[in-house]
Amino acid sequence: MEDEGAGG
């Protein structure tokens, strides 16, 4: 998967 920067 691609890392968008959304780290809940």
Swiss-Prot record:
Q: Where is this chain's protein located in or outside the cell?
A: Secreted, Cell wall
Q: What is its main location?
A: secreted
> What cellular component terms from Gene Ontology apply here?
extracellular region
| Glycoprotein as UniProt keyword | no
Q: Which domain of life is it from?
A: Eukaryota
Question: What is a biological process (GO) this protein takes part in?
Answer: cell wall organization
What keywords were assigned to this record? Cell wall, Cell wall biogenesis/degradation, Secreted
Outline what the protein does.
Answer: Is a major protein component of the cell wall. May play a key role in the organization of the cell wall and in promoting the survival of this parasite.
Name assigned to this protein: Wall protein 1
